[in-house]
Amino acid sequence: MKIIGIIQARTGSKRLKNKVLLKLGDRCILEILLERLKKSKKLDDIIVATTIKKEDNAIVELCNSLGVNVFRGSEKDVLDRFYNASKFYSGDVIVRITGDNPLTSIELIDKQVEYLLKNNFDYVSTKNIILGLSSEVFTFDALEKAWKNAKEKYQREHVTPYIYENPNLFKVFYLEPPEYLKREGIRLTIDTIKDFKLYLELQKHFDLINVDIRQIIDFLDKNPQIKNINSNVRQKSYREVEE
């Protein structure tokens, strides 16, 4: 049983170009995420899945310099990229992580993997938590079925909708999140320049590789002027696709 974390990352985001390579202190966003993921007790391997586009050579070079496995695939059909990366690296269970969420909860990753394995679920995630902390866990078999059957553009771009939209075909489970993560009004994903500015403020006060999420939440509650930097950023629906 091999459990792999796959980080989807590219430089061509429309709202914030090169975002995963932007520096927070002496490390870029993707590097901070990679370092944090090393704390997981469940992941056997971590792979960065980027695109075949020339502009993403920089991501490949970074991964090579860090000794991190990398896979290149379709830019728009991210489901195909995940399927082929999982197949290439022989993953039985896959954790989907996005490269613009450097503070992805390691606690939740490990709990989700545990629940999936103990209960023979096909898919496990966590709803209603601070944006930027979540991940998804699913079996290779579920991924393969989605890869074969998903037809809609958004299902191909966002990887997992075909799975969780079909609970009659898959055993889908959502963990109850810890109370401290059930918060509205805090946004910790990096999608826009405002999101990045908030992280620049956090970086002044914390070691982002080792900080506990509770410290971040407490800090933002005590500093609403920082918390509100990105409060008016619109979060896109998973059914929206980039043309």
Swiss-Prot record:
Source domain of life: Archaea
CDD domains given in the database record: GT2_SpsF
SUPFAM superfamilies xref list: Nucleotide-diphospho-sugar transferases
GO cellular component: cytosol
Record Pfam families: CTP_transf_3
Protein name: Uncharacterized protein MJ1063
Lineage: Archaea, Methanobacteriati, Methanobacteriota, Methanomada group, Methanococci
